[in-house]
């Protein structure tokens, strides 16, 4: 369901003039000559690069230019590339390395802490500062030249069960920081911080603290915003996906739809006020979230130029919304999903009561890891395809009343799953092609380029180059499990592909021409 806050959303009549192409480029932040300066590459979340030096015709010729071993856990972060420096993270660690040679410029190690060390998404860079979130829910500002700490502020109380893996989103003078925490019954929060001082500017609650008058979440907590959002400067709206409600599997303890959990919310970055919200899964009892990336596209839909936001959600459904208002335009499954009986008038799947967690277990698809997850999709404007790492999987969900109404409040067990990269037609939701990625769930996101290439990883530890038009394999390399989204950058006239495999970063490029 979409809820619109009166007077806040820009009408479609005020939208910018669209170009004559079917899908237009939403120019929101400059991808400085070949750099990758934000988590998604730009504000749209499309993860589409304009670089064209590496093509379908020559990608088989790329060779390893450099590698960098972190010595820590699996890299799940998107590297940031700015001013010839690569910034990459792991829990408690930030590295600055030379983008030409992988020479380490500095390394920051956060003090030992009792936070939850599940992974890390990356940093934000602003002027001469690098911003990093910590496992115990702090935000640290580092000097971009030296790695020295400028300031350190608390975003949320780790003793209550909050942590952060979030790559902050910088919107003008607002640094938006999300947290996680669904082992406890905690309200979902997104905090805006002054990047100069660390002072809190505002806090948005997806589920208000218990006891809040007129609480729209129907007594649920949760709805954490742990993934990096997207931004439309023309509407001045930030789009963020929210997580699951808590207690996670105990639905009877939180009757109702549980707004704004499992939702896409549109917020004013200057005030934190909600413009509208769309709930992808009402009353979620399977830990599916809707934290996945809200991708912004300016395109023709149903014959009309429209400002769109689309999401391949963890519940196995693909959504296309009008981002002026949050009105649903399309809802289609993109992965195996047996938990709904249909789609309601607001574009939301209708839950099947027979698939609710039960004492004797219920076989449900997707499983707890979802039809997709944190791994980012990519939108290719030339083909109009959203490339999504999909997971077809079943799990058995249990609910036991004696587990109570706190935290997880039940159990679930994955049974079987396979992965595929699926190319979704944004106008119909149809799968135009798919490329099998193997047994289990892939941890790799997706990158597309203007030359017609798609990069991702499979479950066997290979990074892949595919032809975007049909999914044909053009190149691959075994590097260990890929847990992040590939990026690309250009430096000194040379295009690089940068991917994390295991605990190392690998950069490929075409052979240098003889001088």
Where are the language model's segments positioned?
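Beta-propeller blade signature
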Residues: 188-198, 257-271, 419-425
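Bacterial N-terminal signal peptides
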Residues: 12-25
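Loop/turn-rich, solvent-exposed surfaces of beta-rich toroidal or solenoidal domains
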Residues: 391, 415-468
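Phosphate/diphosphate-binding loops
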Residues: 295-335, 359-367, 502, 510
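Repeat-blade elements of multi-bladed beta-propeller folds
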Residues: 36-40, 72-93, 115-139, 163-187, ...
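Structural recognition of the beta-propeller blade-terminating site
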Residues: 98, 143, 194, 268, ...
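Aromatic (tryptophan-biased) beta-strands that constitute blades/sheets of beta-rich domains
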Residues: 31-70, 103-112, 148-157, 199-207, ...
